[in-house]
């Protein structure tokens, strides 16, 4: 346990941020999984919709500082490839 007052405060804010980041990451994983599963099932319409939702979630996570923008770009690109393969 920290003895310094400022470090005690930092520990509290770090814990709040950890929980917030955990929530964002969890919803992000769910959105990506739904898009992947729809693409695997061959449902073009659902896959397209879920891809759009996942892209939005990824962008939000980047703006909140939860993930790096390059990681989001890679994930969006991979999803787009899977959905594009269904369409094309």
UniProtKB/Swiss-Prot annotation:
Binds directly to 16S ribosomal RNA. Keywords: Ribonucleoprotein, Ribosomal protein, RNA-binding, rRNA-binding. The lineage of its organism: Bacteria, Bacillati, Actinomycetota, Actinomycetes, Kitasatosporales. Belongs to the bacterial ribosomal protein bS20 family. Residues 1-30 are annotated as: Disordered. The keyword RNA-binding applies. GO terms for molecular function: small ribosomal subunit rRNA binding; structural constituent of ribosome. One of its GO terms (biological process) is translation. Pfam families: Ribosomal_S20p. InterPro entries: Ribosomal_bS20 (IPR002583), Ribosomal_bS20_sf (IPR036510). GO terms for cellular component: cytosol; small ribosomal subunit. NCBIfam families: S20. This is Small ribosomal subunit protein bS20.
